[in-house]
Amino acid sequence: MKEPIQYHNQEELNKFLEKGVIIPEPQSVKIERSINLPQIGKGTFLHPFSRIEGEQSYIDESCEIGIAGAVTILNSGVGKGSRLGTLGPVTIKDTFT
């Protein structure tokens, strides 16, 4: 059976905030523990219900994730200045294959 995904806790999320990642509602954002500080760029805005999973995932600087709806980044990269939003849930998955 696959192990459940482990997410950063509030104290760990604070390190992303200190680095310049903008998370207005940290209790609603999930970042997998395999994601390290350098993998999410300064000035990136993570809207409520954003999820970042997969150890290969990264988000460059000045991105906006989860505009108008839930977005999941799964083993994928998001380029500098990208804006991801939706009218419903979106998953971006395995963009490196």
Q: Which ranges hold each PLM region?
A:
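Domain-scale signature associated with acetyltransferase and cell-envelope carbohydrate enzymes
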Residues: 1-97
